[in-house]
From Swiss-Prot:
This is Small ribosomal subunit protein bS21. The keyword Ribosomal protein applies. One of its GO terms (cellular component) is ribosome. Belongs to the bacterial ribosomal protein bS21 family. The gene is rpsU. Keywords: Ribonucleoprotein, Ribosomal protein. It holds the Pfam family Ribosomal_S21.
């Protein structure tokens, strides 16, 4: 879970920016988008296979 503690002299805008950055680093939005619709086992395998190819290419 992502938490942002507001500093004493910190504005809401900067805290919101930090929160958005932490959420994107944690991959929460990508996970929510992926789980929005049911994914069949075949689609899961295909997604994982593509991710593996991407990882190999950038190594």
């Amino acid at each position: 879970m992502v938490q942002v503690v507001l500093g004493e002299d910190e504005g809401i805008e900067s805290a919101l920016r930090r929160f958005k950055r932490q959420v994107s680093k944690a991959g929460i939005l990508a996970d929510v988008k992926r789980r929005r619709h049911f994914e069949t086992p075949l689609e899961k395998k295909k997604r994982k296979r593509i991710a593996t190819r991407r990882k190999r290419r950038f190594r």
